[in-house]
Amino acid sequence: MPKGTEPTMPASSYSGVQALPPRRIKVIGVPLDLGASRRGVDMGPSAVRVAGLEARLESLGHEVNDGGNIAVAIAETKHVGEHHARYLKEITDTCTKAAEMVEHALQDGMTPVVLGGDHSVAAGTVSGVATFYRKQHQKIGLIWIDAHADLNTPETSPSGNVHGMPLAALVGLGPEPLANILGFSPKVAPENVVIIGVRDIDITEKENIRRAGISEVYTMRDIDERGMRTVMEEALRAAGRGTAGYHISLDMDWIDPEDAPGVGTPVRGGATYREAHLAMEIIADHGRMVSFEIVEVNPVIDEHNRTADLAVELISSAFGKKIL
């Protein structure tokens, strides 16, 4: 067929070659914004759903069950609490609910896909995954894809915003209520934690990386110099070593604001559109992802839902969509 005469596909149709066996996927919305100072990420799960997540995943042969949203507290009805860890009680309560839902999804043989919400929800998501595999005497790996390290604690945080603390909680540095969700800490061994794409990191977070014993940290400079494929191959090997598989925690501010404008804490110099897709495609190629979450989509400051649309595209790539 000559170029330019191809039939136009309906807007609701998607093409893609499946690289993964069909999965049963459980979508869990966590519309939490108490961990961030900028409001709006509580609408992230709805924006991602409106962008066609379910149809995209089903077009790849996966079975999708949407569990709806977890009920969360709103700032207008709660006291901020300790200013060094704002709304910590409410965030811990929400993350505990998320952890339980994620664990139940895995018990039912489903792959959890969690939609945030700010990045504090990861303290719940990863706790649920770690609990499920711990009961089988197995460990998990963690791929943390983010412009920020999220390794602050109440003692080091300049803002008191808990969305800057979830990775610290997961490796056992605190805050203690988040670190001990479902009764144990740490959730992930430091040798199986990989941070990718960081480019805005506090001095105290650098110290906490060393304290925690995390050695696999790839900055945007590493990606620039060595390429996304090399970085991802090394990262997945480290996260997968001696584990049942790994959780993917993707903060949309990892991507350059030119392509993902609808995030609460944008940082120039992020991953390009194609770099982000390549990272997800390599994750799909390896086939060892046990759970996935995408966070910090903020429709209030987005441009025509571009960031949510991209979030759906990236989830699709992580679940097997290919160009050819």
Where is each model-derived feature located?
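Active-site histidine-anchored catalytic micro-motif
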Residues: 107-181, 190, 286-287
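Catalytic cores of soluble, metal-dependent hydrolases
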Residues: 2-32, 38-113, 125, 132-135, ...
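A general structural motif
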Residues: 174, 194-202, 230-232, 272-277
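Short, glycine/polar-rich helix-capping loops at beta-to-alpha or helix-loop-helix junctions
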Residues: 201-211
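Short gly/pro-enriched beta-turn/loop segments at secondary-structure junctions
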Residues: 187-191, 212, 241-243
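Active-site flanking residues adjacent to catalytic metal/cofactor-binding acidic residues
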Residues: 117, 145-147, 196, 248-252, ...
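Internal, active-site/partner-interface "lid" segment
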Residues: 180-188, 192-198
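Active-site environment of divalent metal-dependent phosphoester hydrolases
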Residues: 152, 201-203, 299-301
